[in-house]
């Protein structure tokens, strides 16, 4: 009897894993404050849906929707992560998910546009090293260095408590990331209209 039950559980888990490409159980920022207890007490009742929204070279951008227990209201966050780190996305409670909350998207997109249109093209003090830093609520940092006739842009965030840097150091890559962010913003707005 126990062997049959164990086999049934393993088959169920295998089927579920075949249907889910990426699962995040620990979430931070807006999800943490509102649903922290529910996430740990009722994991099976929380629905995760992550869609890959384009490959920005070695950056993956995800749109994650989390359905709140009871009301079914969906909260949105954008996750940024590097390629080849999917093994970290397990149900291990130590795994951190860094999100840009949906209400911060316009500000984040504005920062990217500022870097593209002003910082990158109009370095007002080319002989002086200048640094720009922008933070999201969850702690993701968008950092840009300029000066001495060169510039670079980097995203700082953490995966499983380990600091991670992803460089966006050419105009094409920056424009591609900006386009993906704008696409996600439009998609969230469209989803909100349907409710």
List each model region and its residues:
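Positively charged, low-complexity terminal tracts
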Residues: 19-195
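Bacterial Sec-dependent N-terminal signal peptides
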Residues: 1-22
């Amino acid at each position: 009897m126990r062997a049959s039950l164990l086999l049934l559980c393993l088959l169920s888990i295998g089927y579920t894993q075949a249907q889910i490409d990426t699962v995040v159980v620990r979430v931070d920022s807006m999800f943490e404050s509102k649903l922290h207890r529910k996430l740990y007490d009722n994991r099976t009742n929380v629905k995760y849906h992550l869609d890959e929204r384009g490959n920005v070279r070695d950056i993956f951008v995800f749109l994650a929707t989390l359905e709140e227990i009871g009301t079914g209201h969906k909260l949105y966050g954008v996750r940024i992560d590097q390629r080849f780190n999917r093994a970290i996305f397990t149900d291990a409670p130590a795994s951190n998910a860094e999100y840009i909350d949906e209400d911060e998207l316009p500000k984040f997109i504005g920062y990217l546009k500022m870097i593209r249109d002003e910082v990158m093209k109009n370095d007002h003090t080319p002989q002086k090293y200048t640094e720009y830093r922008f933070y999201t609520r969850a702690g993701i940092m968008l950092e840009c260095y300029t000066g001495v006739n060169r510039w670079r842009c980097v995203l700082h965030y953490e995966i499983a408590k380990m600091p991670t840097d992803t460089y966006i150091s050419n105009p094409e890559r920056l424009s591609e990331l900006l386009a993906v962010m704008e696409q996600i913003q439009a998609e969230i707005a469209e989803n909100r209209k349907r409710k």
